[in-house]
Amino acid sequence: MTIEFTDWPQDRAQRYRDAGYWIDQPLTEILHSRCQAQPQALAIICGERRFTYGELDTLSSILASRLAEQGLGQGDTALVQLPNVAEFYIVLFALLKAGIVPLNALFSHRRLELTAYAKQIVPKLLIASREHEVFRDDAYVQAFAEVGAAPAVTLLLGESDPAASLAHWIETPGSQPVAYAPTAADQVALFQLSGGSTGIPKLIPRTHNDYHYNARACADVCALNAHTRFLCAVPAAHNFLLSSPGALGVFHAGGCVVMAASPEPLSCFALVEQHEVNTVALVPSAVALWLQAAPAHRDKLQSLAYLQVGGAVFADSLARQVPGVLGCQLQQVFGMAEGLINYTRLDDSDEQIFTTQGRPVSPDDEIKIVDEQGVPVAPGEPGMLATRGPYTFCGYYKAPEQNASAFDAEGFYYSGDLVVLTPSGDLRVVGRIKDQINRGGEKVASEEIENLLVLHPEVTHAGLVAMPDEALGEKSCAFVVSRNPSLKAPALRRHLMELGIAEYKLPDRIRLIEAMPLTAVGKIDKKQLRHLVSVENTRTWLQTRLRQLIEDSEELDPEENLIFYGLDSLQVMKLAAELKARGIEVSFEELASTPTLASWWALVEARQKAA
């Protein structure tokens, strides 16, 4: 029995084999080849623990045999949720060896996400941590049973009962070895999670052939080798940290993965110094924190050579700081769990590295950039990204409706990204057409949060949109129509938390409005909501900026002439220039003719609306 998935057309599959991309070997070959070449080399450092490639192989084989002893194997699935610990990789290789297909949930996911995943894959096996709030007691058993997905076997990290202790199963061989085998190389190896825009993430089946090539190709582009010391500080389950090139790329090259609980700068700097880490992969929000903290700790970063940044668009202004502040080379990454991975190359020009997201890793990655009618746009013009290739999937798991809208007749996948092709042949990401918020690399689907907000008994309508943020790139703003005009934001966030969503999905800002703006066909007018966010942000900025210029501690009366607060003509000219820099065309003469905060708010709002 195998897991169903949408396969590649035969002609393309044969082409990928002929080119040597698909080698018809399971992902376990990565570990096997390392054990043959360097069994005593370090594979993982996790706190005070060290694991060689030989030990990683032995421990994962013990667990695979124990699982096979329970009757688990090919055709079965596993829901796995572990923090950044060595057990994550021991479990991964054990499941791959046993032919059990894992779905690795992020450690930030809570009851709502976990039960939704379980409902989709109906796992025979659950592996989790007592450290996580969902598994601190045994209430989770009922939660999984309620969705018809009670696992046959549950193993928990931190469990004291040997019968359910993950550590005990890893360290204690069964009474006799039991045979096990991975699924065929052209079958599903694991599920990845989409950054979906329609609620709970859709599942992405990745085969051994395509994922193996994904990791190898990325490792080659990033020049990983046996001397690579790679810091895993972003969740290990992220596709970025698993295969782009991530841990699988490091293992393929014979390097060592150093585990970090989080990307918190000071603890990571200590790990970099202690273990001579030379490569790290981070999301932009984490890089911003590193850039702030690094000047006082530069001596701890002497071994750091490469910083890979992905998961969200990296601002040019931050990118340019990396070499000078962190003392290492920047490599931008633009990829997706569905497949296509782009990198700036290590020998690219500074401008390419600072201002683009690179180009595909494979010669057979096909991309097209088209308008809404599917017509290719002119070079340098923004358009929708569509792609297909040897490691880009051909369909979401059991999702025919989504697949019909995500793929065209030629098999190109439409990612929802808006990109520009630069003269150098690199891609620059300029936006997104999906209704999704990218909060520091974590994807928040607007529809999911909107549907949960209206479950509150006092909420009639809800709309969620992105708002810009310097640290995270984007944050979320929820607009809510309520029967109770006194309803407060904390009550709505409490409501969402009680439903069991991940904390990063909580709206950063919540605003009550009298009526929800709708389009002509009755849908929420997200354009108007984004306009309201822009107006509010500009109002706040304008008031704050005026108080800086005036140097007055008093609250500003919106109707008072600003001249009487000490504002002069030069300052008004400066404000006009700053507003222009923010994309708001307002002249000095217009501001000077009606120098009140209320008038300026109205003028700026009118210009924003017109734009």
Curated annotation (Swiss-Prot):
Classification via Pfam families: AMP-binding, AMP-binding_C, PP-binding
Function: Involved in the biosynthesis of the siderophore pseudomonine. Specifically adenylates salicylate and loads it onto its peptidyl carrier domain, via a thioester linkage to the phosphopanthetheine moiety.
Top EC group: ligase
PROSITE patterns: AMP_BINDING, CARRIER
Protein name per Swiss-Prot or TrEMBL: Pseudomonine synthase PmsE
GO molecular-function terms, A-Z: 2,3-dihydroxybenzoate--[aryl-carrier protein] ligase
Family to which this protein belongs: Belongs to the ATP-dependent AMP-binding enzyme family.
Residues with the O-(pantetheine 4'-phosphoryl)serine modification: S569
Cofactor: pantetheine 4'-phosphate
UniProt keyword annotations, A-Z: Ligase, Phosphopantetheine, Phosphoprotein
GO biological process, one term: siderophore biosynthetic process
Membrane-spanning segments: none
